[in-house]
């Protein structure tokens, strides 16, 4: 049953302060999951307030270094690491991520031992980092467990990682904070073993960007990462993180305009991203999709063969197609082949369930036209 939205008789900042105090009251160990972005910076200062109120000493902070992070962001995180009120754990673990170039996908291992031997790491691992060797692993393959399993090590009792997730950033993040009636902002990490007593807390889920920047600058007189100022000057994307996956790499020119030297190094390590930089503005996505969809299921197979460049991706794609095909047989209008191709080459399909074509898309218009043609043909 749907519930009507209720408004609080307090500001979003005061509400977040109540939530974060509740987190400290509820859990034995509380850590701030820090990325260098403005949202996690706001979380850091909210936690600082609680630590000063209660005399808890330095704030425990976790930073997951993903190697391809902007140099400006890395410098800011290192500056925060040296604050006397911060106790930071800096993790550099080998995790598989995606490199997407004009519809073609391949897995890339962060902090790869092979790329290190080839001199193709974007930068060297900092000497203070916690790395695979600390867990008896190597950098030649991805860590076997979810990363939260490793960052959780050494924490006592029930543990909460506080994150800067905000609901208005995406529908996925919105859904993550509306699934529970009580303590809706406290959730379990995705796919983490239930035996591990770790939860995520998202106390600023109802903030907007203006709330974040005002809180940092006016209430604490603090600074945020310089990257946001650089991005604002060039009209670039306001996001810190890896720029290689299927969504962020479409704004590669924004990252390049903000930090051209960083792109030079990215090009040295992954020369094929230059094709994305040069050709994306003229890339005809619809023709690319229609070319595969017109061949039916043979076109789907060709799409996988030509665009999934690593064996693991091919296996995941084939499983996704098998599930989609079952639904296509039952309802071909809601599950057209063009929508399947679009998900394979443009969207994030790994770890997601197959879904029908959604509104506000070109495939949705095709669906409506197909339904109308069927209705007219059947005389209804």
Label the model's feature ranges:
Residues 1-33, 38-380:
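Nucleotide-activated chemistry modules centered on ATP-dependent adenylation/adenylyltransferase
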């Amino acid at each position: 049953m749907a519930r009507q939205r209720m408004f609080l008789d307090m500001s979003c900042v005061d509400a977040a302060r109540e939530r974060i105090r509740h987190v400290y009251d509820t859990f034995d160990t509380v850590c701030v999951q820090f990325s260098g972005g403005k949202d996690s910076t706001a979380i850091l200062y909210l936690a600082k307030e609680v630590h000063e109120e209660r005399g808890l000493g330095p704030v425990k902070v976790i930073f997951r270094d993903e190697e391809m992070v902007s140099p400006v962001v890395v410098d800011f995180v290192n500056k925060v690491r040296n604050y006397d009120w911060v106790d930071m754990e800096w993790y550099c673990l080998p995790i598989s991520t995606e490199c997407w170039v004009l519809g073609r996908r391949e897995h890339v291992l962060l902090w790869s031992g092979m790329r290190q031997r080839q001199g193709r790491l974007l930068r060297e691992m900092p000497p203070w980092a916690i790395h695979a060797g600390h867990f008896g692993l190597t950098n030649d393959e991805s860590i076997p467990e979810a990363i939260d399993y490793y960052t959780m090590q050494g924490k006592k009792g029930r543990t909460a990682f506080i994150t800067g997730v905000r609901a208005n950033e995406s529908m996925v993040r919105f859904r993550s904070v509306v699934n529970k009636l009580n303590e809706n902002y406290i959730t379990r990490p995705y796919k983490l073993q239930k035996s591990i007593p770790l939860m995520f807390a998202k106390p600023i889920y109802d903030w907007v960007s203006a709330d974040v920047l005002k809180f940092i600058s006016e209430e604490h007189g603090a600074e945020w990462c310089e990257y946001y100022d650089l991005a604002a000057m060039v009209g670039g994307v306001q996001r810190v993180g890896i720029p290689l996956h299927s969504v962020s790499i479409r704004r590669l020119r924004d990252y390049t305009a903000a930090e051209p030297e960083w792109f030079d190094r990215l090009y040295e390590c992954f020369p094929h991203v230059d094709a994305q930089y040069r050709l994306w503005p003229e890339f005809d996505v619809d023709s690319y999709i229609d070319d595969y969809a017109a061949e039916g299921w043979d076109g789907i197979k060709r799409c996988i063969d030509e665009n999934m460049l690593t064996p693991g991706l091919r296996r995941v794609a084939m499983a996704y197609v098998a599930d989609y095909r079952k639904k296509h047989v039952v309802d071909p209008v809601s599950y057209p082949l063009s929508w399947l191709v679009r998900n394979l080459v443009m969207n994030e399909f790994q770890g997601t369930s197959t879904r029908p074509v959604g509104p506000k898309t070109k495939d949705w218009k095709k669906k409506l036209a197909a339904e109308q043609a069927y209705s007219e043909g059947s005389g209804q």
